[in-house]
UniProtKB/Swiss-Prot annotation:
Pfam families (alphabetical): ASL_C2, Lyase_1
GO cellular component term, pick one: cytosol
Catalytic activities: 2-(N(omega)-L-arginino)succinate = fumarate + L-arginine
Organism: Mycobacterium ulcerans (strain Agy99)
PROSITE patterns per the UniProt record, alphabetical: FUMARATE_LYASES
Cellular location(s): Cytoplasm
Recorded name of the encoding gene: argH
CDD domains xref list: Argininosuccinate_lyase
EC number of the protein: 4.3.2.1
Molecular function, one GO term: argininosuccinate lyase activity
Main location, first listed in the record: cytoplasm
Protein name: Argininosuccinate lyase
Entry keyword annotation includes Transferase: no
Keywords recorded for this protein, A-Z: Amino-acid biosynthesis, Arginine biosynthesis, Cytoplasm, Lyase
């Protein structure tokens, strides 16, 4: 049987919890990550208690000195949780009491509950964590942008359904991976507007009767405002679910990029060569160079999706207000951050180190009759209705297939036999260079448009980097 010594809730109970309950309740193995934020919030709480007339100046200064000492010891690892500590809050109260005594240390608990306390700390931790994740995402975007800049005119087969569709610029394709990642960072910036609301002062659920100033402590802790509803503030974890979604979306976007790299590096495609420093070998096959980073990115996306769905399942049936189920809210979010902080630098390094075989990609770009759409659109520009143009281009493909040649190898007579509108001038679009250059609409694959897109990506990256520093 455990004891209630050091517990934050033992007065009403004649004895301690069972060993099984104590083991089940224990959370220091994961919530110790909140310790620096807990100490910071306790400093702000001491100041608010003083302003409310609940501490003398001497008591306030004594608590602040004790908290400074505790913060230093937490930071250097000389203070940590004991087996008997139920959670991070109990461990830190024990540490504070060791430094300032039980009378003074016990005064800090006035006006706050673990319910509003942990909701606040979780938001503080997440606001820092999402910035670290966003910085890592922007590094992947920068690597994509650098590769795009290094290959401004390289042409590759653009695909739909994994079938060759139309020629596009390699830079165009790479930047298509950058934009979703930038939207992920924009989601993080937007998320912070909702996360920057402080639950502190909400108590267990009903608020405080001690004359505390939630707005003051919100400002002291870097929040933009205090919560409008104390029940909502202590019971809601939609901010955690929103963050978990953004993390999962980042993982999904990385997984799609990773899938391309895995396919491109295969012998059959041969678009890219992996750098030795960013790939691994086989324990039995000496020739192998494996895209482990990309494969781990693909695998971890499932893990982060699972973290999101698990959290949502935890939240779905809880009555207001706080329930102990919410002890399960942090581990999936913490894990998602840990995984992304491992993955993002590796993905940035992998992307930046890829060597592209631009000659092979260009040679494959017209394969599969990818210039057929150019033939149809050329006919449209000559005044042919698109239905007729589509049929003529399809007939040209059929003729080329029967002869086992490319569209560009059809003779003038063969083209004219298919449609009198297919004059020799159509050959202007029967090159991959002509095809990509013709697609100069906004967002298109023409070199000048892709150069604009690269500039836009870099401008958005710079703007988001600035917003994350606020």
């Amino acid at each position: 049987m455990s004891t209630n010594q050091g517990s934050l809730w033992g007065g009403r109970f004649a004895g301690g919890p069972s060993d099984a309950l104590a083991a089940l309740s224990k959370s220091t193995h994961f919530d110790w990550a909140l310790a620096p934020y807990d100490v910071t919030a306790s400093r702000a709480h001491a100041v608010v208690l003083f302003r409310a007339g609940l501490l003398t100046e001497e008591q306030r200064d004594g608590l602040l000195a004790g908290l400074d000492s505790l913060a230093s010891d937490v930071a250097d690892g000389s203070f940590g949780p004991l087996v008997s500590d139920e959670d991070v809050h109990a461990a830190l109260e024990r540490g504070l009491i060791d430094r300032v005594g039980p009378d003074l240390g016990g005064r800090l608990r006035a006006g706050r509950s673990r319910n509003d306390q942990v909701a606040t700390l979780f938001r503080m931790w997440l606001r820092d964590a999402v910035r670290r994740v966003a910085t890592g995402v922007l590094e992947v975007v920068a690597a994509l942008g650098d590769q795009a800049a290094a290959h401004p005119t390289a042409i590759m087969p653009g695909k739909t359904h994994l079938q060759s569709a139309q020629p596009i610029l390699l830079a165009h394709h790479l930047l298509a991976h950058a934009h979703p990642l930038l939207r992920d960072v924009e989601r993080i910036v937007d998320f912070d507007k909702r996360a920057a609301v402080s639950p502190y002062g909400s108590g267990a659920l009903a608020g405080s009767s001690l004359g505390l100033d939630p707005d003051a402590i919100a400002a002291d802790l870097g929040f933009t405002t205090a919560a409008d509803n104390s029940v909502d503030a202590t019971a809601s974890r939609d901010f955690a679910a929103e963050a978990a979604f953004v993390f999962a979306m980042i993982a999904v976007d990385l997984s799609r990029l990773a899938e391309d790299i895995i396919i491109w590096s295969s012998t059959e495609f041969g678009y890219v060569t992996l750098h030795d420093s960013w790939s691994t070998g086989s324990s039995i096959m000496p020739q192998k160079k494996n895209p482990d980073i990309a494969e781990l990115a693909r695998g971890k996306s499932g893990r982060l999706i699972g973290n999101l769905t698990g959290l949502l399942a935890t939240l779905k049936s809880q009555p207001l207000a706080y329930n102990r189920d919410l002890q399960e809210d942090k581990e999936p979010v913490f894990d998602s951050v840990v995984q992304l902080e491992l993955l993002l630098p590796a993905m940035a390094g992998l992307v930046g180190s890829l060597t592209f075989d631009v000659e092979r990609m260009a040679a494959l770009a017209p394969a599969g009759y990818t210039l057929a759409t150019d033939v149809a659109e050329w006919l449209v520009r000559q005044g042919v209705p698109f239905r007729s143009a589509h049929e003529a281009a399809g007939a040209a493909v059929r003729t080329a297939e029967e002869r086992s040649v490319g569209l560009e190898e059809l003779t003038d007579d063969e083209l004219a036999a298919i449609s009198p509108e297919l004059t020799p001038q159509v050959r202007d679009v029967l090159t991959i260079e002509g095809s990509v250059s013709a697609r100069d609409s906004r967002g298109g694959t023409a070199p000048k448009r892709v150069a604009e897109q690269l500039q836009i990506v870099r401008e958005i990256t710079a703007r988001l980097g600035h917003e994350l520093m606020r």
